[in-house]
Design a protein with these regions (language model features):
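Short N-terminal signal/transit or membrane-insertion segments
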Residues: 1-2, 48
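Active-site rim elements
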Residues: 3-8, 79-86, 131-135
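Short, contiguous alpha-helical
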Residues: 8-23, 29-73, 114-169
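Helix-adjacent hinge/juxtasegments
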Residues: 57-58, 64-104
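Active-site-proximal loop and beta-strand segments within enzyme catalytic domains
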Residues: 106-114
């Protein structure tokens, strides 16, 4: 099995899980955050909805500067409802899947750089960046999102087995 097959299987498994979580994001609470230093619910949910698209950046670009000195700052997409989030996830997963289907192990072994303000903060083979910087990072933020949802009283869907909210009895 090659990297692409593994990552495609991960994407196919994790996308429906993320969809179930995003469907539970309560409209009207997107500016809420559990702590003053935490990110807002809407921003965190937007990340969970759009992170699969990052696969295309890792496959198609040699580097990414997340805070370019003279370049544009990140402008998050205007996602205002759980329906917007689910639609964004479906589009991002489709783009991520296409990027993975268009690459191979030789390309994924090539180096990829993450920069901030022109300074290299990480340089790894693309397959490592996909695993750590995209897929595991995505799952991490989805986990954070479930905590936010629980604090808001939402029922948590099953992730890798039944949740306490979905258990019978």
């Amino acid at each position: 099995m090659n990297y692409t097959d593994i990552f495609l299987a991960d994407l196919d498994r994790e996308t429906p899980v993320s969809r179930r979580v995003l469907e539970r994001v309560p409209d009207g609470h997107f500016e809420w955050k559990p702590h003053e230093k935490s990110m807002q619910l809407g921003y965190l949910a937007m990340m969970v909805a759009t992170m699969p698209e990052w696969l295309g950046m890792v496959v198609g670009m040699d580097e990414l500067d997340i805070a370019p000195k003279d370049g544009p700052k990140f402008d998050p997409p205007p996602l205002k409802t759980s329906a917007d989030l689910v639609q964004a996830l479906d589009a991002a997963a489709k783009k991520g899947k296409a990027a993975l289907q268009g690459t191979n192990d030789a390309h994924l072994a090539k180096p990829w750089k993450l920069l901030s303000g022109g300074r290299v903060i990480q340089e790894t083979p693309r397959h490592v960046q996909i695993r750590d910087g995209v897929l595991s990072h995505w799952v991490h933020h989805r986990g954070q999102l479930t905590v936010y949802l629980k604090l808001l009283g939402a029922k948590i869907p099953s992730i890798y087995g039944p949740s306490g909210d979905e258990k019978a009895g």
